[in-house]
C-alpha cells in the first residue's frame, strides 16, 4: 500500500478542508515554528486509532477539534482521512480486493468518535487489524514524532521489545494467544462452576431422595384421609338434611297457632278503631272551639293596638311640631349672620387688590435689571475657563516630562537588576555531574528488580482472593442452611403453641367457668410428664380427668348441682403423700412411667392408675389377661384397654385429645431450638471469620498494587531525571552564550536611557516656571469671577422675594373672593331650610286634628263579651274529649295484652327458623365441600355400604381423620414437588457430567493451541531478532562512518526477554548507550528504526524533525540513507534542515498567515528545477 493523500478538516489548526498530496516516495513538510507541521503527524496517529489525548499533545480528546480563533468560530467536528493505493492488494482481510482504501475518523463535540473504511463504518479494532504487522499504528515504529528518537533509544528493554514484535509481525500471534488465554480462562471458570454445581447437586439429590419418600407417604395418607373425610361429610350432610325437615314441620305447626292468635287480635283492633274515631271527632270539636277563642282574642288585641297607636302618634306629632318651630328660628338667625360677614369680606377684597398691583410693579422692575448682571458673570467665567485650559496643558506637559524621567529611572533600575540576575545565572551555570548519571542508571536497575518482586507478590495475593471468597461463600451457605433449620423449628413450635392455646380456651365451658370464677385455675395435664409414646395411653385411662381442676375441698362442688357444667368437667382434691404400692410380678404399672416430682400428685395418680398396667402391643396385652389382678386392666401405647373380660379400643373423642403429646413435643422443640441456636451462632461466627479472612486478603491487594505503582513511578522518575540531566548538559553551553549576548544588549540600552532622562529633566525645569505664571493669572481671575457671581446671586434673590410677595397678595385676594361665595351659598341654604320646616309644620297641624280613638273604644267592649262566650264553649268540648280518652285507653290496653300473647309464639317460630337455617347451612356446607371436591355421592354411598359398620359412624370417621392429620403433621414440612425435582435434578446431573467432560477436552485443546502459538512465536521472534540485529550492525557504520552496534536479549526465554541496544561510535568504548551525546543517540535510533524497516518495510514512514540534533555531516549521511530506503518505503518527513530538504521530491509548505489557521502550499522539486532551467 502507498499513501496518496491526507485530508484534514477541523483538526487542530487545519480548520478548512485541506488536502495534502503525497505523490512520490520522498515528501518534505517545511514551515516556520508553530505553523502546525506537527499537527500532520498527530492527525496520522489519530486516524490510526490513538485514544490517549496526551500522545496528541492535549488534555482531552476534544482538544483535537479546532477551538476557534480571533476571526473564526470553533469547529463542530474534526475529520482526518488517509487515502491508500492498494493496487498490489497488500491490505489485510476483506479490504485486499479494493484498489483504493480510504481510512477516515470523525469526532464530534458530543464525544462521538466514528471510524470509516471506504465510507463503511467500522470499529477501531478493524482499523488496527488492517495495519496489523506492518509497523503502522498509533504507537508503531513507522511514526517517529518529536522526542520519540530519544524515547526509543532510552526505552526500557520491555518497551523496546514491542518494536521488535511489531517488526516480526507477531502481533497477530499475540492477539491469538491472548484470545486463546481468555477462552482458556473462561473455560476453566466454567469448569469450576460446573464442578461446584455438581457438588451442590449431589448433596441436593440426597436431600431430594429423602424428601421424595416423605412426599410418597404424605400422598398415601392424604388419599386415605380424603376418602374418610368424604364419607364423614356425606354422613353429616344426610343428618343435617333430616334435621332440617323435622324443624320445617315443627315451624308449620307453630305458624298455625300464631295465625289463630292474630285473628283474635284483629277483632280487638276493630273495636279499638271505632272508639278512636269517636275520640278523633271530639278532638276536632275541641280544636274548632279553640280556633274560635283564638279569633276572639285576636280581635281584642287588634282593637287595643289601634287605641295605643292613636295615643303614640299624637305624642310624636306634638314633639315634632316643637322641634320644627325651634329649627325655623335657628335658620333665620344664620341668614342674618351671613349678610354681615359678606359685607366685611367685600371691604377686604378691595384692600387686597391694591397690594397685588404694587407687588407686581416692583417684581417687573427687578426682572429687567437681572440680564446685565448675568452677562458680566458669563464673560468672567469664559475668561477663567480659557486660563484653566492653558494651565492644564502646562501641567500635562510637566507631568509627561516627570513621567519620562521616572520611566527612564525605572528602566535603568530594571536593566541593572536583570544584569545582576544574568551575571548570577552565568556564574551558577554548570553541566550535570557524570557520577550522578551513573548513579541514576544503577538506581533504575535496582528499581526494576524491586518492581519485578512487587509484581510477583501482587500476583500471589490476587490468587488468594478467589480462594478466600469461595471459603466465605461456603460459610455463608452453611449459615443460611442452619438459619433455615432454626426457622423451621421455631415455626413448628409457634404452630403447636398456638394450637395448645386454642384448645385451652375451654370451648363451651368457658362462660360457665368465668361465671363461677374458675377460669384462672390450671389443668391437671399441665403438671403431667410421661415417657415418650405413652401419652395416648394416659389420656385413654384418665379421659376427662386429664383436664381436671384442683380444689381444696371436693364438698365445695355441691354448689354446682343446680347449675351443672355444660360439658364434661372434673375436679380433684390433692391427697396426702403415700408410698407407691408394689406391682404384681411381671407387670409394669402405668403410674411408674410418669415423671412427677410432687409426692402429693404422685399419690393421686397412683390412686387413679392403681389397677392399670402396660403392654407394648395389643397381642401381649391380650396374653397378659390371665395375670391381671381383679378389676385391673392393661393399656397399650395406642390407648386400647384390655381387662379380663373386654377389649376397649381408644379413639380421640374431644378437641382436647393429644394435649399431653403436644405439650411434650413443645418441650422437646424448645430444647432443639436452643441447640440449633448454638449451631447457628457457630455458623455465623464461621461466616465472620471467613469474611475477615477475605477482607484481609482483599485489603492486602490494594497496598500491593499501590507498591507496584509507586515503584513504577519511582523508576519512571529516575528515567526522567536521567534524561533531564543529559538535556541539561547540552543546553548549558547554549544558555551561556545567550546570557553573554543579553548582557551586551543591556549595556547599550542603558546608554540610550540615560540620554533620554537628561533631556526630560531640562524640559521639566522650563515647564515648571511657565506653570507658576499661569497659576498667578488664574487666581486673579477666580477672585473677580466670585465678586460678579455674588452680585448676580443678590439680584436673583431680590427678584425671587418680590415675585413671592406678588404671588402671596394674589392668593389672599382669591381667598377673600372664595369666602364671599361660600357665605352667599350658606345664606341661601338657611333660607331654603327655613321654608321647608314651615311647610312640614303646617302638615303636622292637620295630622293632629285628624287623630280620634273613640270608635276603637266602643268596638273593644263588644269583642271582650264574645271572647267570654267562646271560652265557656271550649271548656264543654274538652270535658267530652276526656271521657272518650278514658274509653280508648281501656281498649288499647286490651289490644296490648293480646299482642304480648303473640310474642312467645313468634319467639318459638324464630327459634325453629334459626334451627332450620342452621341445619340448612350445615347441609349446604357439606354439600358445597362435596361438590367442590367433585365427589360422586352415589358411588360413595355404594362404597360405604360395602365397608364395615364403623365407616357409617361419624365419631369413628372423625377420629380417623384426626389420626391421619396427626400422622401428616408428624411428617413435618413436605416438599410435594420432590419427585419431579428429583427427576429434573438427575437429568441435570447427567447433562452437567457431559458438559464437564466437554470442558476438560476443550481445556486440553486450548493448552495445545497456546503451546503451538508459543512455538511459532518463538521461532519467528528469534529469526526476526537475528535479521534486525544484522541490519542494525550494517546501518550503524554507514551513519557514523564506522563503529559497531548490536542488540542483546536480557533473558534466556525469548518470549519474555527484553531487548537492549549496545552502540559504540568510532573511537569510543562506552559501556552503555546512555553515555552517548544527543546527536549520537539520534543517529543510533535512526539506524535501529531503519533496520526494522529493512526487515518489514511499512507502507510509509513519518519523521518529525528527526534530524534536529544532527550536524551537517551527519545530516547528509542521514539524508543519503533515507533516499536509498525510499525505494522500498514512502517517507513523509518534517525538517528545518536545508540538506534534508534537498532530498525531497516534493515540498509541502505549511503557513499561518491567518492567526491560528494552517494552510499548505505544495511544490514539486523536479518541476521547479525544470521551470528554472527553462527560464534561464
UniProtKB/Swiss-Prot annotation:
Gene Ontology cellular-component annotations: chromosome; cytoplasm
UniProt-listed NCBIfam families: SMC_prok_B (TIGR02168)
Function text: Required for chromosome condensation and partitioning.
Family, per entry: Belongs to the SMC family.
A GO term for molecular function: ATP hydrolysis activity
Natural source organism: Bordetella petrii (strain ATCC BAA-461 / DSM 12804 / CCUG 43448)
A biological process from GO: DNA replication
Residues in coiled coil: 169-506, 653-947, 987-1024
Keywords annotated in UniProt: ATP-binding, Coiled coil, Cytoplasm, DNA-binding, Nucleotide-binding
SUPFAM superfamilies per the UniProt record, alphabetical: P-loop containing nucleoside triphosphate hydrolases, Smc hinge domain
Main localization (coarse): cytoplasm
SMC hinge domain residues: 521-623
SMART domains per the UniProt record, alphabetical: SMC_hinge
Positions annotated to bind ATP: 32-39
HAMAP family: Smc_prok (MF_01894)
PANTHER family named in the record: STRUCTURAL MAINTENANCE OF CHROMOSOMES PROTEIN 3
Cellular localisation: Cytoplasm
Domain remark text: Contains large globular domains required for ATP hydrolysis at each terminus and a third globular domain forming a flexible SMC hinge near the middle of the molecule. These domains are separated by coiled-coil structures.
Protein name: Chromosome partition protein Smc
A Pfam short name: SMC_hinge
Assembly and binders: Homodimer.
Amino acid at each position: 500500500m502507498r499513501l496518496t493523500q491526507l485530508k484534514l478538516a477541523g483538526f487542530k489548526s487545519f480548520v478548512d478542508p485541506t488536502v495534502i498530496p503525497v505523490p512520490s516516495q520522498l515528501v518534505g513538510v517545511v514551515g516556520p515554528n508553530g505553523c502546525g507541521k506537527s499537527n500532520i503527524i498527530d492527525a496520522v496517529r489519530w486516524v490510526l486509532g490513538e485514544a490517549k489525548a496526551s500522545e496528541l499533545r492535549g488534555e482531552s480528546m476534544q482538544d483535537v477539534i479546532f477551538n476557534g480563533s480571533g476571526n473564526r468560530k470553533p469547529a463542530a467536528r474534526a475529520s482526518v482521512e488517509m487515502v491508500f493505493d492498494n493496487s498490489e492488494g497488500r491490505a489485510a482481510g476483506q479490504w485486499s480486493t479494493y484498489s483504493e482504501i480510504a481510512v477516515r475518523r470523525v469526532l464530534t463535540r458530543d464525544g462521538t468518535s466514528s471510524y470509516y473504511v471506504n465510507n463503511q463504518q467500522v470499529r477501531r479494532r478493524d482499523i488496527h487489524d488492517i495495519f496489523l504487522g506492518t509497523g503502522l499504528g498509533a504507537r508503531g515504529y513507522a511514526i517517529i514524532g518529536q522526542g520519540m528518537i530519544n524515547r526509543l533509544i532510552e526505552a526500557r528493554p520491555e518497551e523496546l521489545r514491542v518494536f521488535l514484535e511489531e517488526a516480526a509481525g507477531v502481533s497477530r500471534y499475540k492477539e491469538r494467544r491472548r484470545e486463546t488465554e481468555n477462552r482458556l480462562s473462561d473455560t476453566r471458570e466454567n469448569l469450576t462452576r460446573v464442578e461446584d454445581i455438581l457438588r451442590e447437586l449431589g448433596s441436593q439429590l440426597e436431600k431430594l431422595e429423602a424428601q421424595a419418600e416423605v412426599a410418597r407417604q404424605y400422598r398415601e395418607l392424604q388419599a386415605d384421609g380424603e376418602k374418610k373425610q368424604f364419607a364423614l361429610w356425606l354422613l353429616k350432610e344426610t343428618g343435617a338434611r333430616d334435621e332440617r325437615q323435622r324443624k320445617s314441620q315443627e315451624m308449620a305447626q307453630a305458624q298455625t297457632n300464631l295465625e289463630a292468635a292474630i285473628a283474635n287480635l284483629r277483632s280487638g283492633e276493630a273495636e279499638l278503631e271505632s272508639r278512636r274515631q269517636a275520640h278523633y271527632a271530639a278532638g276536632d270539636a275541641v280544636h274548632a272551639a279553640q280556633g274560635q277563642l283564638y279569633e276572639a282574642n285576636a280581635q281584642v288585641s287588634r282593637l287595643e293596638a289601634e287605641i295605643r297607636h292613636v295615643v303614640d302618634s299624637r305624642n310624636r306629632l306634638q314633639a315634632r311640631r316643637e322641634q320644627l318651630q325651634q329649627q325655623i328660628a335657628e335658620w333665620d338667625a344664620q341668614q342674618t349672620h351671613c349678610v354681615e360677614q359678606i359685607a366685611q369680606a367685600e371691604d377686604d377684597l378691595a384692600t387686597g387688590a391694591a397690594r397685588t398691583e404694587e407687588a407686581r410693579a416692583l417684581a417687573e422692575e427687578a426682572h429687567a435689571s437681572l440680564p446685565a448682571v448675568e452677562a458680566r458673570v458669563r464673560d468672567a467665567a469664559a475668561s477663567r475657563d480659557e486660563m484653566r485650559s492653558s494651565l492644564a496643558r502646562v501641567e500635562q506637559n510637566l507631568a509627561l516630562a516627570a513621567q519620562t524621567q521616572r520611566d527612564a529611572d525605572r528602566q535603568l533600575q530594571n536593566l541593572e537588576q536583570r544584569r545582576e540576575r544574568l551575571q548570577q545565572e552565568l556564574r551558577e551555570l554548570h553541566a550535570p555531574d557524570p557520577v550522578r548519571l551513573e548513579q541514576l542508571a544503577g538506581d533504575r536497575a535496582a528499581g526494576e528488580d524491586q518492581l519485578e518482586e512487587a509484581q510477583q507478590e501482587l500476583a500471589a495475593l490476587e490468587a488468594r482472593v478467589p480462594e478466600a471468597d469461595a471459603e466465605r461463600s461456603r460459610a455463608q451457605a452453611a449459615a443460611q442452611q442452619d438459619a433455615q433449620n432454626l426457622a423451621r423449628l421455631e415455626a413448628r413450635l409457634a404452630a403447636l403453641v398456638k394450637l395448645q392455646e386454642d384448645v385451652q380456651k375451654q370451648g363451651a365451658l368457658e362462660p360457665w367457668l368465668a361465671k363461677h370464677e374458675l377460669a384462672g385455675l390450671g389443668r391437671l395435664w399441665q403438671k403431667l410428664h410421661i415417657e415418650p409414646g405413652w401419652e395416648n395411653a394416659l389420656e385413654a385411662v384418665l379421659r376427662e380427668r386429664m383436664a381436671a381442676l384442683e380444689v381444696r375441698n371436693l364438698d365445695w362442688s355441691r354448689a354446682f348441682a343446680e347449675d351443672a357444667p355444660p360439658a364434661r368437667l372434673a375436679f380433684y382434691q390433692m391427697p396426702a403423700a403415700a408410698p407407691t404400692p408394689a406391682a404384681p410380678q411381671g407387670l409394669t404399672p402405668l403410674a411408674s412411667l410418669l415423671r412427677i416430682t410432687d409426692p402429693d400428685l404422685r399419690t393421686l395418680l397412683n390412686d387413679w392408675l392403681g389397677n392399670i398396667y402396660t403392654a407394648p402391643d395389643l397381642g401381649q396385652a391380650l396374653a397378659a389377661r390371665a395375670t391381671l389382678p381383679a378389676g385391673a386392666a392393661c393399656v397399650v401405647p395406642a390407648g386400647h384397654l384390655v381387662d379380663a373380660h373386654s377389649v376397649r379400643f381408644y379413639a380421640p373423642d374431644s378437641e382436647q385429645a393429644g394435649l399431653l403429646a403436644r405439650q411434650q413435643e413443645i418441650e422437646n422443640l424448645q430444647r432443639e431450638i436452643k441447640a440449633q441456636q448454638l449451631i447457628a451462632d457457630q455458623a455465623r461466627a464461621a461466616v465472620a471469620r471467613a469474611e475477615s479472612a477475605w477482607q484481609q486478603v482483599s485489603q492486602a491487594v490494594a497496598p500491593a498494587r499501590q507498591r507496584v505503582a509507586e515503584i513504577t513511578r519511582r523508576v519512571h522518575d529516575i528515567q526522567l531525571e536521567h534524561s533531564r540531566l543529559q538535556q541539561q548538559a547540552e543546553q548549558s553551553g547554549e544558555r551561556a552564550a545567550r546570557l553573554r549576548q543579553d548582557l551586551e544588549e543591556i549595556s547599550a540600552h542603558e546608554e540610550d536611557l540615560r540620554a533620554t532622562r537628561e533631556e526630560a529633566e531640562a524640559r521639566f525645569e522650563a515647564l515648571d516656571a511657565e506653570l507658576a505664571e499661569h497659576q498667578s493669572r488664574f487666581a486673579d481671575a477666580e477672585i473677580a469671577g466670585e465678586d460678579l457671581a455674588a452680585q448676580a446671586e443678590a439680584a436673583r434673590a431680590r427678584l425671587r422675594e418680590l415675585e413671592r410677595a406678588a404671588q402671596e397678595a394674589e392668593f389672599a385676594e382669591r381667598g377673600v373672593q372664595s369666602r364671599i361665595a361660600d357665605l352667599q351659598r350658606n345664606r341661601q341654604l338657611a333660607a331654603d331650610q327655613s321654608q321647608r320646616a314651615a311647610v312640614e309644620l303646617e302638615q303636622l297641624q292637620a295630622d293632629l286634628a285628624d287623630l280620634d280613638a273613640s270608635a276603637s273604644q266602643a268596638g273593644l267592649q263588644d269583642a271582650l263579651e264574645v271572647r267570654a262566650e267562646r271560652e265557656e264553649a271550649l271548656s264543654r268540648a274538652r270535658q267530652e274529649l276526656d271521657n272518650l280518652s278514658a274509653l280508648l285507653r281501656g281498649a288499647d290496653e286490651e289490644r296490648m295484652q293480646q299482642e304480648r300473647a303473640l310474642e312467645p309464639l313468634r319467639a318459638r317460630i324464630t327459634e325453629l327458623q334459626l334451627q332450620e337455617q342452621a341445619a340448612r347451612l350445615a347441609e349446604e356446607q357439606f354439600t358445597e365441600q362435596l361438590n367442590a371436591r367433585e365427589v360422586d355421592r352415589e358411588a360413595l354411598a355404594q362404597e360405604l355400604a360395602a365397608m364395615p359398620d364403623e365407616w357409617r359412624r361419624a365419631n369413628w370417621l372423625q377420629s380417623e381423620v384426626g389420626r391421619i392429620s396427626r400422622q401428616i403433621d408428624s411428617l413435618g414440612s413436605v416438599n410435594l414437588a420432590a419427585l419431579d425435582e428429583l427427576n429434573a435434578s438427575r437429568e441435570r446431573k447427567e447433562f452437567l457430567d457431559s458438559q464437564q467432560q466437554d470442558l476438560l477436552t476443550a481445556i486440553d485443546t486450548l493448552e495445545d493451541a497456546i503451546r503451538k502459538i508459543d512455538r511459532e512465536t518463538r521461532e519467528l521472534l528469534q529469526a526476526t531478532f537475528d535479521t534486525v540485529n544484522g541490519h542494525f550492525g550494517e546501518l550503524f557504520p554507514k551513519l557514523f562512518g564506522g563503529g559497531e552496534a548490536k542488540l542483546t536479549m536480557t533473558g534466556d526465554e525469548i518470549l519474555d526477554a527484553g531487548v537492549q541496544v549496545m552502540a559504540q561510535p568510532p573511537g569510543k568504548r562506552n559501556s552503555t548507550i546512555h553515555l552517548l551525546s544527543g546527536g549520537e543517540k539520534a543517529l543510533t535510533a535512526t539506524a535501529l528504526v531503519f533496520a526494522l524497516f529493512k526487515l518489514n518495510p511499512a507502507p510509509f514512514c513519518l519523521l518529525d524533525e528527526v534530524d534536529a540534533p544532527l550536524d551537517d555531516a551527519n545530516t547528509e549521511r542521514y539524508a543519503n540513507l533515507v533516499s536509498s530506503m525510499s525505494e522500498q518505503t514512502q517517507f513523509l518527513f518534517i525538517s528545518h534542515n536545508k540538506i534534508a530538504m534537498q532530498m525531497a521530491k516534493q515540498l509541502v509548505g505549511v503557513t499561518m498567515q491567518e492567526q491560528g489557521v494552517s494552510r499548505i502550499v505544495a511544490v514539486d522539486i523536479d518541476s521547479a528545477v525544470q521551470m528554472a532551467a527553462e527560464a534561464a
